[in-house]
Design a protein with these regions (language model features):
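Small-residue-rich segments within alpha-helical transmembrane domains of MFS-like 12-TM solute carriers
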Residues: 38, 42, 124-132, 163
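Cytoplasmic helix-loop-helix junction between adjacent transmembrane helices
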Residues: 119-157
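Membrane-interface helix termini in secondary transporters
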Residues: 50, 78-82, 171
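Helix-loop-helix hairpin linking two adjacent transmembrane segments in secondary transporters
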Residues: 153-181
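Extracytoplasmic
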Residues: 25-59
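Residue-level signature of mid-helix packing/kink "hotspots" within the transmembrane helices
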Residues: 42, 70-78, 162-163
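Conserved MFS/SLC helix-loop-helix module at the cytosolic interface between two early adjacent transmembrane helices
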Residues: 75-114
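Juxtamembrane helix-start elements in MFS-like secondary transporters
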Residues: 58-66
Length: 181
């Protein structure tokens, strides 16, 4: 009887260690998604000195580029709140992140102001979906007692994006071109 309990205890510990490793991987992936989403949102403001002369646009037109992402992200996040609960969260996150990558790549490849504006709207539509899904996944996966720690870990991506992501993106813009970040 004692051997059986020891075996059961060993298997429980092994499963617990496996789950902790998986938790860390999940948190890293979710934080990376938040990081890229926030860098993409924030990078436009400091790129104004590159974009306005490149596209020969006014400061008002540049403000459209900055706000296009914000408004489309807000609209998609609000609208998605009514629909996405019926779908698998992982699939919605993957769908949103795929669209976000396409929109972000389109931003870097945009040859004109209007195409960049459309690409910013597209990236924002999917970016808004990402932010909501990340928090929903944390709420689903982590027990109540661990949720605050998990959300804090993922939300630290905001601080990292602003302190390291944006300066690195500006470094790439200086080194290569505004298309790089």
């Amino acid at each position: 009887m004692d051997k059986r309990w020891n075996l059961i205890w060993f298997k429980i510990q092994k499963l617990n260690n496996y789950w902790k490793k998986k938790e860390k991987l999940i948190l890293f992936v979710l934080a990376a998604a938040q990081f890229t989403h926030i860098v993409d949102f924030m990078i436009m403001m400091p790129l104004g000195n590159y974009l306005m002369p490149y596209f020969k646009i006014s400061t008002q037109q540049f403000s459209f580029l900055v706000s296009a992402y914000t408004f489309s992200a807000a609209a998609s996040g609000f609208t998605a709140a009514f629909f996405v609960d019926g779908f698998d969260r992982k699939k919605v996150l993957l769908f949103g992140y795929t669209g976000f990558i396409i929109g972000t790549l389109a931003c870097g490849l945009a040859p004109s102001f209007y195409l960049l504006l459309v690409a910013r709207v597209l990236a924002g539509l999917f970016g808004g979906l990402i932010g909501a899904q990340v928090l929903s996944i944390i709420s689903d996966i982590f027990p109540y007692e661990q949720r605050g720690k998990a959300m804090g870990s993922v939300m630290s991506a905001f601080a990292i994006a602003s302190t390291f992501g944006v300066p690195f993106a500006l470094y790439l813009a200086n080194l290569i071109s505004w298309h790089a970040p």
